[in-house]
């Protein structure tokens, strides 16, 4: 059975108003910092995302585009390092990032919808909680996290696959929180209106 844990990412840092707003499209691949591999995929070598056939990860509920939403995603694939940077393509970690942006012209309404997604789908009433889960079934494990800022819900899923994928160290809550904080900072710096 999955083991669930939660931690507060940034309690009190998100104002109740929609003062944070993202008016334009967001490139999810521009959000991760250079230290993402060290934070979320230690002991691996990054390889092209198409190198291994992997299952698609649903990062946050309702992460498909629809009326009033725009979704962008990014996949980063890491293979277990056999030593000296030699990748073992049999064991991998897939990091999938998704950005759900509510496009309502009324920024308060858009922020309310983003908050509602966090509340309804992720059980987070404040919109700033980091939720992670770990499961292991048939050689597959997954962790996930999500955070809301203004009219955007940012999510990440970390999925491991392969016969010896357990040899890739799992990302700790601190690692996941640091990666989410980095991505949120980039989002606010580069995409805020």
What are these model-derived regions, one by one?
Residues 9-12:
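C-terminal motif of bacterial Sec signal peptides marking the signal peptidase cleavage site
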Residues 1-3:
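Bacterial N-terminal signal peptides that target proteins for export
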Residues 17-193:
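A small/polar (G/S/T-enriched), proline-flanked helix-loop surface module common
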């Amino acid at each position: 059975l999955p083991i669930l844990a939660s931690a507060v990412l940034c309690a009190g840092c998100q104002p109740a108003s929609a003062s944070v707003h993202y008016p334009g499209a967001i490139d999810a691949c521009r959000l991760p910092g250079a230290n993402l591999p060290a934070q979320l995929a230690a002991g691996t070598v990054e390889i092209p995302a198409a190198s291994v056939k992997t299952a698609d990860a649903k990062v946050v509920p309702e992460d498909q585009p629809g009326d009033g939403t725009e979704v962008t995603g990014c996949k980063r694939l890491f293979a277990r390092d056999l030593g000296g940077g030699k990748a073992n393509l049999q064991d991998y970690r897939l990091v999938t990032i998704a950005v759900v942006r509510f496009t309502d012209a009324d920024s308060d309404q858009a922020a309310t919808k983003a908050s509602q997604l966090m509340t309804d789908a992720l059980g987070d009433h404040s919109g700033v909680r980091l939720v992670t889960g770990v499961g292991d079934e048939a050689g597959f494990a997954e962790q996930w996290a999500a955070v809301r800022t203004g009219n955007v819900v940012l999510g990440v899923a970390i999925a491991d696959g392969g016969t010896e994928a357990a040899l890739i160290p799992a990302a700790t809550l601190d690692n996941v929180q640091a990666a989410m904080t980095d991505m949120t900072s980039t989002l606010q710096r580069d995409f805020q209106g």
